A protein has these predicted regions:
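Helix-biased detector of long, well-ordered alpha-helical tracts
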Residues: 1-145
Length: 145
């Protein structure tokens, strides 16, 4: 759709940095990174650094992404996970701190996506229909031959 195309271009060419939101909530985050290299890259890096398993139960997206993917014969998960360039904050937090972050996000009209949970183990997995599917790092790779 044209609406999605305009939104996607704006995210790349005029990213909306959520610096103040990140700074205000930094004490509530147990870890955080930006998603500029793609969500799959960010989640795999966070998993590697924390030595924890990340289980994704919900793709962070609006219906327009799915509609765009379907109308252009693209895989919506590839668009969501491997695109990058949007500079959104990806963070982990405790259940106790989540309401505080949600309240601040609502106050500043920032849409939050709860996409999964962190547990013992390693790697990043997408939980679909009860099965865990490993999510590979397919985002932007710097200085690769």
């Amino acid at each position: 759709s044209k609406k999605f195309g305009a939104k996607a271009k704006r995210a790349v060419f005029k990213p909306n940095c959520r610096l103040m939101f990140g700074l205000k909530n930094k004490n509530y985050f147990s870890s955080s990174m930006d998603s500029s290299d793609g969500l799959s890259t960010t989640l795999n890096e966070m998993s590697s650094q924390s030595k924890k398993r990340f289980v994704i139960t919900r793709m962070p997206s609006e219906n327009d992404v799915f509609e765009f993917a379907a109308s252009n014969k693209l895989n919506s998960n590839d668009l969501i996970l491997n695109g990058g360039e949007e500079y959104e904050i990806v963070a982990t937090t405790s259940k106790a701190n989540l309401p505080k972050i949600k309240k601040d996000a609502k106050k500043h009209r920032i849409k939050l996506y709860e996409i999964g949970y962190v547990t013992k183990g390693t790697g990043v997995f997408y939980k679909r229909k009860g099965k865990l599917i490993r999510m590979k790092d397919k985002g932007w790779q710097h200085l690769q031959p």
